[in-house]
């Protein structure tokens, strides 16, 4: 959906990579920077069009647009502009690498990205990771995580979630029973049974399984996971369950959490708005409005400032 909106905008006077490249060149040359022109071009083009603009810029001016913006801009505005110049899967790959490099691992980031993507997105992210860093994403994840979290992430990296649109009622009942036997129905939890179901079944099938579970046990799946698991594994399982139930709602909640209370988690705002822009951002906006009785644009507007605010708000329109 988001794609259609971006497309509509870029066609109101025809997309022209050459003209956009010139506009960006003019915005950055000489003293000072014309931020408004940069915002206008970056926010009104699709990801594919921005790739063409980058190419055109390099041909005409013999420079990488990223390098130019990197030296001209600063702060969160710069981060967002550079994120927009990456293909979404490259950007996700960079975020994963950042989550793992150096001391310590940002498990929450690994979970947010790997537990929310479709097979096709996972495959594209793995390819981008290999291309950008000359390493296998799977072996880096294996090295940087351990125990049951490692198992579920590696399962997800196989990109073997069923994508059939039909629901097998019998399988849902069987899976619900297996999940009961693996969790509530025994001492300790058998994570392999959870992984098998959570990483392999389609979202539609999972919803049927959670319903069957509710009927069988009289408890919802989230409650069981809260009781039976802990730490990062719990976070990963809950993320998959929430995404299966309502992917757009899951991202709406993350955005809300990034802004509510004191301080703002700008990194999360950038990551979600940029990566979901051409996937389901319109749906996320609608879900945000429904859940929190306020518009996402308004909340972003009151929680950010300057050119960063202008760029995010432009991306949300």
Curated annotation (Swiss-Prot):
Main localization of the protein described in the UniProt heading: membrane
Family annotation (Gene3D superfamilies): Annexin
Swiss-Prot/TrEMBL keywords: Annexin, Calcium, Calcium/phospholipid-binding, Cell membrane, Cytoplasmic vesicle, Lipoprotein, Membrane, Myristate, Repeat
Disulfide cross-links: none
Location of this chain's protein in the cell: Apical cell membrane; Cell membrane; Cytoplasmic vesicle
A cellular component annotation (GO) from this entry: cytoplasmic vesicle
Tissue specificity remark: Detected on the tips of microvilli in small intestine (at protein level).
Pfam families attached to this UniProt entry: Annexin
Lineage top rank: taxon: Eukaryota
Comment, domains: A pair of annexin repeats may form one binding site for calcium and phospholipid.
The protein's assembly and partners: Monomer and homodimer.
UniProt family annotation: Belongs to the annexin family.
Name by which UniProt lists this protein: Annexin A13
Species: Mus musculus (Mouse)
Lineage: Eukaryota, Metazoa, Chordata, Craniata, Vertebrata
Gene name linked to the record: Anxa13
């Amino acid at each position: 959906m988001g794609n259609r909106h971006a497309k509509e905008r870029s066609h109101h006077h025809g997309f022209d990579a050459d003209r956009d490249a010139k506009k960006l060149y003019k915005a950055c040359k000489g003293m000072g920077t014309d931020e408004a022109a940069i915002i206008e071009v970056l926010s009104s083009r699709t990801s594919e069009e921005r790739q063409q603009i980058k190419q055109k810029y390099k041909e005409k001016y013999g420079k990488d647009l990223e390098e130019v913006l990197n030296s001209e801009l600063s702060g969160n505005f710069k981060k967002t502009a550079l994120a927009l110049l990456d293909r979404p899967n490259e950007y996700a790959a960079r975020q994963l690498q950042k989550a793992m490099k150096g001391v310590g691992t940002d498990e929450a980031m690994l979970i947010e990205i790997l537990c929310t993507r479709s097979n096709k997105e996972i495959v594209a992210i793995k390819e981008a990771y290999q291309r950008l860093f000359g390493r296998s994403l799977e072996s880096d994840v294996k090295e940087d995580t351990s125990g049951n979290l490692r198992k579920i992430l590696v399962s997800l990296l196989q990109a073997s979630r069923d994508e059939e649109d039909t629901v097998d009622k019998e399988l849902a009942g069987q899976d619900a029973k297996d999940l009961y036997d693996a969790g509530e129905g025994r001492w300790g939890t058998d994570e392999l049974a959870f992984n098998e179901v959570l990483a392999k079944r389609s979202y539609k099938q999972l919803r049927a399984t959670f319903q069957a579970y509710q009927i069988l046990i009289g408890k919802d799946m989230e409650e069981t996971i809260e009781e039976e698991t802990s730490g990062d594994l719990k976070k990963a399982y809950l993320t998959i369950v929430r995404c299966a139930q309502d992917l757009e709602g899951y991202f709406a909640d993350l955005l809300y959490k990034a802004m509510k209370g004191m301080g703002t988690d700008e990194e999360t705002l950038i990551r979600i708005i940029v990566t979901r822009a051409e996937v389901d951002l319109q749906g996320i906006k609608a879900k945000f409005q429904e859940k929190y009785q306020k518009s996402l644009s308004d909340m972003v507007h009151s929680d950010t400032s300057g050119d960063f605010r202008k760029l995010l708000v432009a991306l949300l329109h």
